[in-house]
Amino acid sequence: MSVTTVLFDLDGTLLPLNQDEFVIQYFKHLAAYLAPHGYDPELFTKAIYAGVRAMTENDGRDYNEAVFWEEFSHFFPQAREEMHLFDDFYANHFSKLQAFCSCNPRMRALIDRVKESGRTVVLATNPVFPATATEQRIRWAGLVPEDF
């Protein structure tokens, strides 16, 4: 049996970081950004963890994103109407979290070698992050989303 597909983990493998510290900083930065818009930071943190828990318990009945927002909206019913705030955070502020990561330039060469061997390259990552955050973290690793 030959290997046809190689799965790479993003956080901690392709993108070196302390995942626990990164998640703490991520939630802290997002909560601080949203606080002036009526999102109490303490309640916000509880809402995030409740949404993440709902995703981990998702039995496939719906997409993780839908499951997250359904749970999060119990805490902040206005959140779905204020998605522009979240979009702005990811477009203009999420990049500050790159300071909590490093880059291993050998990963670029490794991905290239695997692809040149004819194997399919697949990315695995934490479902906590929306697509835009995942794409940014891929770039922080010195890669591009099209690599996967």
Range-by-range predicted roles:
Residues 24, 28, 66, 131-136:
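Short, surface-exposed alpha-helical segments at coil->helix boundaries
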Residues 122-148:
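Substrate-recognition "cap/lid" segment bordering the active-site pocket of phosphatases
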Residues 14-16, 54-55, 125-129:
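Short histidine/acidic/glycine/proline-rich micro-motifs that form metal-
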Residues 1-47:
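Active-site neighborhood of HAD-like aspartate-dependent phosphohydrolases
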Residues 14-16, 97-101, 107, 139-148:
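A generic "structured core" feature
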Residues 42-92:
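A metal-dependent, Asp-based hydrolase signature
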Residues 39, 78, 143-144:
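Helix N-cap/coil-helix junction residues
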Residues 62-67, 79-84, 91-123, 135:
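Short, acidic loop-to-helix structural element flanking the phosphoryl-transfer center
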